[in-house]
């Protein structure tokens, strides 16, 4: 009788039950962590067998009544493994911040650290006509060696490559500080450029290792701000001894904090003997590296000489331009035949391509490289030619002209902050900050042209801030997007992005220099100045000795020359506007598929990234974005010493 009454009560209760209660309960109940999922599967299987057995015997045992094995966390308890993972993740993040901030600041400092000292350095060596080589020696090597350091990071390990970069910085800084000849100074600057290529590239690779895109976005947000600070304070803390001191401290911090945390090399691992260096070098793409260095280096050299030192039709310009272009094309041909199964891969079976040709099969690689190229063009043009404008046209002293650049840095900071929100909070995607940043930079740089034409100082300062905001908007999303597109090729993907930015800046500077010299040369000769070197700030003093009318003519000619120099780089910005429309999208915090998997306890949060390889706007027009989405699973890094980190 008691059993029958209980049965009737349960039937009435189930009949009156709100059908939405189960859905609400399912939505609000705490999802099982991935570590308890195997136990949950076992429990469900055991329950189904038990229910099938007892139902055949007419038992009234409740269907969901299953004992939890000992040691399995209950619903209201926190999994100890999850707690340890979160703790390890927090410790790892702070180790990265403490260990890599100084190397990253050092890399950004060296781009502008000698800016205010250029006139005095050149006068010391009596080389005013070669002043531009203090900058060119650095930018040339810092651009050409970026992909090589990316491959070194893969073959020899992140830590060893980072220490090598810091060591080269110490040697280069010592040579600069102790330089007795002009050649010795340029050698030191060239070594600093090689070091900068390694530091910038390896730090970005490390920040992408062993973490999800969501976690990487948080850390890279901070380092983007740190980089902006480095660019800003470089001219004020100028001096090669500063670089030496920072490099020594960075060496120590990296060794103490990160020696057990960084990803090991594929060939040269921790504990390997020195005899293992040669077998590891055998896997490096030596021929590709040589072709790339000569190709890019000669192209930069030709554009630096063309229109400034020699005419564009001179053999000194045409020879390096033609040879460099041939080497650059041959590099991509060689990388194509170094793909697995092709002829060079069979001849050199151990070698690994520096920039695998297969990377360009996904079009976002090309579009992103163009966007990064334009980012470098916008940034370098502001850093160098705004100072020339205020010195030449507005007759500001060098110190005051340098202060005007500070308007660019707050704008960059605002852009970085907006990018942090767009990547980490809403909409947590890369497409929107990349395109918004491109639009803002293009509009800002175009308005700089107008402001220079009208000689409106307030408008110039405001547009510098706007351009800086556009630059800051693109820094972090570009690296996150590339990692999302190529999670299995982090080092070469990051190397390509790190190369495109300074390459765009360096080529843009040489183009602007050629345009400026050609436009301004006639006016300065007519005014009796005998010509003006764009990089020689000391030669600007000749204007003050001219008659007032001649001064006005020369300064107006300088204004127009600088305006046309900026107009010359606007097509690069326009090209990036168009290519931005063809970029796909990466969901840094994917929701749909991951949430479903979390309900079943399959994966941890942030262990997936979702990406669209076709143009995102095309997917929107088709009205079915989800059908184009691909899920990139984050593969756990086996070499990690810390639990809970995945290789994005």
What feature does the model see in each segment?
Residues 146-287:
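Helix-loop-helix hairpins in multi-pass membrane proteins, especially solute transporters
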Residues 121-122, 152-153, 176, 185, ...:
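Interfacial helix-cap and linker-helix signal at transmembrane-aqueous boundaries
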Residues 108-112, 177, 193-201, 228-232, ...:
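Small-residue-rich segments within alpha-helical transmembrane domains of MFS-like 12-TM solute carriers
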């Amino acid at each position: 009788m008691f059993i029958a009454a209980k049965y009737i009560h349960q039937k009435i209760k189930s009949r009156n039950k709100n059908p939405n209660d189960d859905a609400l309960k399912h939505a609000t109940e705490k999802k099982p962590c991935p570590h308890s999922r195997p136990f949950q599967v076992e429990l469900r299987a055991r329950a189904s067998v038990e229910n099938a057995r007892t139902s055949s015997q007419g038992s009234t045992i409740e269907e969901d009544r299953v004992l939890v094995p000992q040691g399995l966390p209950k619903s209201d308890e926190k999994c100890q493994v999850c707690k340890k993972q979160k703790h390890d993740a927090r410790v790892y993040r702070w180790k990265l911040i403490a260990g890599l901030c100084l190397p990253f600041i050092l890399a950004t400092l060296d781009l502008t650290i000698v800016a205010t000292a250029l006139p005095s350095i050149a006068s010391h060596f009596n080389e005013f006509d070669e002043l531009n080589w203090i900058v060119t020696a650095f930018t040339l090597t810092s651009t050409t060696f970026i992909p090589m350091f990316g491959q070194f990071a893969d073959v020899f390990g992140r830590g060893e490559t980072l220490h090598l970069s810091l060591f080269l910085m110490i040697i280069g800084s010592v040579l600069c500080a102790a330089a007795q000849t002009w050649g010795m100074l340029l050698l030191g600057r060239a070594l600093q450029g090689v070091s900068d290529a390694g530091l910038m590239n390896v730090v970005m690779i490390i920040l992408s290792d062993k973490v999800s895109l969501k976690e990487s976005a948080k850390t890279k947000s901070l380092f983007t701000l740190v980089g902006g600070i480095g660019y800003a304070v470089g001219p004020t803390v100028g001096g090669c001894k500063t670089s030496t001191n920072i490099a020594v401290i960075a060496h120590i911090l990296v060794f103490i904090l990160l020696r057990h945390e960084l990803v090991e090399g594929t060939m040269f691992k921790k504990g390997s003997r020195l005899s293992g260096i040669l077998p590891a070098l055998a896997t490096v793409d030596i021929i590709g590296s040589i072709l790339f260095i000569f190709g890019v280096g000669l192209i930069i050299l030709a554009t630096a000489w063309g229109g400034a030192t020699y005419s564009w039709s001179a053999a000194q310009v045409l020879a390096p331009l033609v040879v460099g272009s041939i080497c650059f094309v041959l590099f991509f041909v060689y990388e194509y035949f170094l793909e697995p199964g092709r002829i060079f891969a069979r001849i050199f079976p151990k070698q690994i391509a520096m920039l695998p040709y297969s990377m360009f099969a996904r079009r976002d690689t090309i579009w992103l490289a163009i966007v990064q190229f334009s980012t470098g063009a916008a940034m370098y043009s502001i850093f160098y030619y705004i100072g020339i404008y205020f010195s030449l046209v507005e007759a500001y002293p060098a110190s005051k002209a340098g202060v005007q650049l500070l308007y660019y840095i707050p704008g960059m900071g605002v852009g970085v902050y907006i990018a942090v929100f767009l990547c980490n909070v809403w909409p947590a995607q890369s497409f929107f900050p990349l395109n918004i940043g491109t639009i803002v930079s293009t509009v800002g740089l175009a308005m700089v042209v107008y402001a220079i034409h009208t000689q409106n100082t307030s408008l110039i300062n405001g547009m510098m801030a706007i351009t800086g905001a556009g630059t800051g908007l693109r820094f972090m999303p570009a690296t996150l997007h590339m990692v999302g597109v190529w999670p299995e090729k982090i080092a070469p993907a990051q190397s390509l992005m790190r190369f495109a930015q300074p390459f765009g800046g360096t080529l843009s500077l040489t183009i602007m220099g050629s345009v400026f010299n050609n436009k301004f040369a006639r006016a300065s000769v007519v005014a009796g100045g005998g010509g003006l070197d764009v990089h020689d700030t000391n030669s600007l003093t000749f204007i003050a000795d001219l008659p007032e009318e001649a001064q006005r003519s020369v300064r107006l000619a300088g204004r127009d020359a600088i305006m046309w120099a900026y107009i010359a780089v606007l097509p690069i910005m326009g090209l990036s506007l168009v290519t931005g429309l063809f970029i796909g999208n990466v969901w840094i915090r994917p929701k749909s598929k991951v949430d479903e998997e979390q309900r079943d306890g399959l994966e941890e949060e942030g262990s997936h990234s979702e990406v669209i390889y076709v143009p995102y706007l095309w997917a929107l027009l088709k009205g079915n974005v989800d059908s184009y989405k691909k899920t990139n699973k984050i593969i756990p890094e086996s070499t990690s010493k810390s639990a809970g980190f995945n290789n994005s």
